[in-house]
């Protein structure tokens, strides 16, 4: 039977991609349905209990700047907050938080259940309704049919998921959850390229069986960082430390002597695993010269005794897992409460997607999260938000939107996936972005909140706070520009006490702030330049904008030069065999990838600068040289 009411957008899957997609579509006023196999696992952290990190924290801030959920949820659930790379420049500083799994799930579910225009329904999806190469709905396990103008697939590792522990394996979407086999078969019938990937998770340990007294502690930062631009540290629950132990030669001997029982090394697992989050058996074999690896013992929550040993992801048999765990300091009597495992699953080649994350072949069908070959909650959330907002726009007959590489890490992520594809689980790093100085965590709102407002993602409260911050930045910069101190002034001695070289001429507040030894906090403690802003976010922006002004201007020039060709559109129907002068290799690659723009084409391996020049000349001759806005 058909459900009586049609929807604008259907989201299939309630993980980190699905929840952001559902919230985005509903915030934009579209009638949205979130279908999940289990309402109790909405926002579930399937692997590590943490949000953020290098590159990943940047994505979380961008999701937040566009009105998303993840940053707000972790502010309510984070039990340890740290700034990584704090001693380095602002471009690579990143926020990371340990999470209480239960509090995080509660925060996500509460947000979903209180979101207007959003209905949640518990049923596994087994089929899609596709008519004339357009998706028009979904069919659940019990045969109930839902109609919609757009469908977003955010099914994580559930598509034909297979769990491996040692040489034993069984079907599963993750531990304790069934796989999605009928939907996997249905998707394989569509004209989409499909592959297999794998990921893994470590065994969970009973904290009561660990001797923490012999282990080093790792505390969070004080003052505590905050993830959301709308958040504050008072929202954070109780803060707790993590602990550090190490593998040793005994651990490595156990692993080496049992490799024949590893499904990965025995050839049972076909899927490719994540390069930057390898299993412990992979680390021991790939880095044979290392006699130890650092392992972080991370609490799973304030009311749980489970510990997540970050760094020993494994699919070795349970008896070997016990030996590995008990070989480490402080863990000699440790008990495992959940075994580690590897999971293999289907993913679909993201080169078959438009930058909006809509399929090139099935109109109205969007893909987000691990189904696109990524790994990580943050990468999934960012894709979910983008797919959700574009599904909402499509259902309202509006043009899609995707950020450029120069606008956001989300733009880098989507461009990498849609242009280059991936053969292994894709993880975001700051090193993937060409314009890191522009794409900082601290300015994600300055880059994206205005766009989010235009798209209908940003509510009145966030918009008012954003504009207040902009005014504070502008007013403070004007104040510092127009406040001067001379070498002969009474205040000069006070100022000179904080400078490596005394004043030799008149200097403004901004002149002084540009000096390496001067900080905004120090400057505004001096009589001529007091008082400091009470708005800490605005104060941080003032300091960064002043200190890095020259570098930022230079990078902006680079972006503008690049954009002239970047935004030159390529017709979707263009057969590159028509373009004389291109090599057979370039023709084959361009016809295979079907890039949307010259920028995308230039990033395809094997497409040379000479080929790009030929293409630009040909487009001009044909009168087809068009640039996107």
Swiss-Prot record:
GO terms for biological process: tRNA methylation; tRNA wobble uridine modification. Its main location: cytoplasm. FAD binds at residues 13-18, 125, 180, 370. NAD(+) binds at residues 273-287. GO terms for cellular component: cytosol. Its cofactor is FAD. It is found in: Cytoplasm. One of its GO terms (molecular function) is flavin adenine dinucleotide binding. Keywords: Cytoplasm, FAD, Flavoprotein, NAD, tRNA processing. Homodimer. Heterotetramer of two MnmE and two MnmG subunits. NAD-binding protein involved in the addition of a carboxymethylaminomethyl (cmnm) group at the wobble position (U34) of certain tRNAs, forming tRNA-cmnm(5)s(2)U34. Belongs to the MnmG family. This is tRNA uridine 5-carboxymethylaminomethyl modification enzyme MnmG. It comes from Escherichia coli O127:H6 (strain E2348/69 / EPEC). The lineage of its organism: Bacteria, Pseudomonadati, Pseudomonadota, Gammaproteobacteria, Enterobacterales.
